[in-house]
A protein has these predicted regions:
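Interface amphipathic segments
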Residues: 1-186
């Protein structure tokens, strides 16, 4: 039971230290190692809501499965690369193992309502993907006004030059609004 935590010091992860004021509503049912949780979190970095089942939570390879919603979450601040990444709003089903390292794996099936990338905010993206430390396998369908495409395949980033096996159908890609080409240089 959760009473096992009574009197134990809690170490705050670096990420939470930069989150500013954190408002957290958390319901947990189960043991430390296997529990159901409902979470609503609001921070200066954005908002998170989740309904998850955690297994092996105290082990080296925690497993999780459930539903996740991100609202206006600042990926740039979290990753330390605000020049490339902006904010994300997304909702979907999630299943995974670990939170980093060589055994990390996450599967996501849902919708990215907005994603800031390279100074442009993409909208209306459907994503079904399996992702590991160096591998992406999945399907991305973008219905953004400036980027309409379907990607289905695999990219392995573990080598010096990524190994790619995919099919892409590109309907529209407006390079200037997307910030891929600056000004009228074409």
């Amino acid at each position: 039971p959760i009473t096992e935590l009574a009197g134990e010091p809690v170490e705050i992860p670096e990420l939470l230290k930069s989150a500013g004021i954190v408002r957290l509503q958390l319901n947990v049912n189960g043991s430390l190692n296997d529990f159901q949780t409902e979470l609503n979190g609001q921070t200066d970095l954005g908002n998170v809501a989740a309904k998850l089942h955690m297994k092996n939570a105290t082990g080296s390879k925690p497993e999780y499965e459930g539903w996740l919603e991100l609202h206006n979450l600042n990926l740039g601040a979290i990753s330390g690369d605000s020049s490339l990444l902006g904010r994300i709003s997304a909702v979907g089903e999630i299943r995974g193992q670990g939170f980093g390292g060589p055994d990390f794996f996450v599967a996501f099936d849902g919708k990215i309502n907005r994603l800031g990338l390279n100074s442009y905010t993409y909208t209306n993206i459907e994503l079904t993907a399996d992702m590991g430390p160096s591998i992406f396998t999945g399907r991305i369908q973008s219905n953004d006004p400036h980027a309409q495409f379907l990607f289905n395949g695999r990219i392995d980033f573990s080598k010096e030059h990524p190994d790619m096996d995919f099919i892409a159908n590109l309907s529209r890609l407006d390079l200037i609004p997307l910030g891929i080409i600056l000004g009228d240089s074409i």
